[in-house]
UniProtKB/Swiss-Prot annotation:
This is DNA polymerase delta subunit 4. The gene is POLD4. The keyword Transmembrane helix does not apply. One of its GO terms (biological process) is DNA biosynthetic process. Belongs to the DNA polymerase delta subunit 4 family. Its main location: nucleus.
Amino acid sequence: MGRKRLITDSYPVVKRREGSAGHSKGELAPDLGEEPLPLSVDEEELELLRQFDLAWQYGPCTGITRLQRWHRAEQMGLKPPPEVHQVLQSHPGDPRFQCSLWHFYPL
C-alpha cells in the first residue's frame, strides 16, 4: 500500500522568483506623497448627516426624514446635535440632505 493521495498532488508545484526590483509580498507600496483632497462644504455637511443617521442613540431613522428624526429626538430629550438642525434648515428641499442614509434602500 502506497502513500495516501492528497488533492494537492494533482497540481504542479510552482516556485516563484522575486520580481526584478526585489519586491516581495511583505513590502508596502511606495508613498506617493499625495494627501487626500479636502472635503467641500457640502461633503462635510453630508458626512455630518451620515454620522447622525448612524448614531443609534437618537432612535431609528428608517421611514422618516432626518428633520423628523431630529425633532423626535429633541422631544424625547435625547439632545440631538444643533449643527445637524442648522444643516437641515439650510437645505430645505434637497433630498440629499433631507432623506436619511437608508432612504434609497427598500424596506
